[in-house]
Amino acid sequence: TDLGLGFINDLRTVTYKWKAPSELDSALPGYNADKTEAEYTNKMYGFIAQEVKQALDDHNVTDFAGWTTDDEGVQGISYEMFVMPLVKAVQELSAENTALKARLDAAGI
């Protein structure tokens, strides 16, 4: 994968709670004026789809299945698709760590 540490570093994690359907923009398909309670009340952890799209654009990636948009323009995230970029990022960090250790060993530190 071309997505690794640079891409992961460009992502901003957020915490949020779902809004009640009545609080959504009335143009969105999930809007329902009669539903005043959120379906999920637990604190959620994740990304903002628009920011993921920007990070993908910044890395010239057009075929990452971790970001989607439906026919109505609603953007979404598929979190399981972030596993491979995360593995790549760990591999890149491991290689950097190995190189730094070698430099320290060579310097007798």
Where do the PLM segments sit?
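Stable alpha-helical elements in mature extracytoplasmic
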Residues: 1-7, 48, 86
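Acidic, glycine-rich loop-and-strand cores that form catalytic or ligand-binding grooves
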Residues: 3-39
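Glycine-rich, acidic and aromatic/proline-enriched surface loops and short helix-turn segments
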Residues: 10-13, 49-62
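Poly-acidic low-complexity segments
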Residues: 19, 48, 77-78
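Short linear sequence elements within intrinsically disordered, low-complexity coil regions
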Residues: 21-23, 50, 84-87
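Short, conserved beta-strand/beta-arch hydrophobic-aromatic motifs that form part
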Residues: 44-46
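C-terminal intramolecular chaperone/auto-processing assembly modules
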Residues: 58, 62-109
